[in-house]
Amino acid sequence: QVRKYCPKVGYCSSKCSKADVWSLSSDCKFYCCLPPGWK
């Protein structure tokens, strides 16, 4: 599931840290990294 935007709490990166939730969004070239347990 690709998000339209990466939430403000997240960040765009080619590689997220192990603790982060890996997500995809249209405004990110690679991955949208989100903090664990985010809502």
Curated annotation (Swiss-Prot):
It is found in: Secreted. GO terms for cellular component: extracellular region. The keyword Lipid metabolism does not apply. InterPro entries: Meleagrin/Cygnin (IPR012573). Keywords: Disulfide bond, Pyrrolidone carboxylic acid, Secreted. Signal peptide: none annotated. Denaturation temperature (Td) is 98.3 degrees Celsius. Its main location: secreted. The modification Pyrrolidone carboxylic acid is found at residue 1. It comes from the Eukaryota. Disulfide bonds join 6-33, 12-28, 16-32. Gene3D superfamilies: Antimicrobial Peptide, Beta-defensin 2, Chain A. It holds the Pfam family Meleagrin. Belongs to the transferrin family. This is Small basic protein 2. It comes from Anas platyrhynchos.
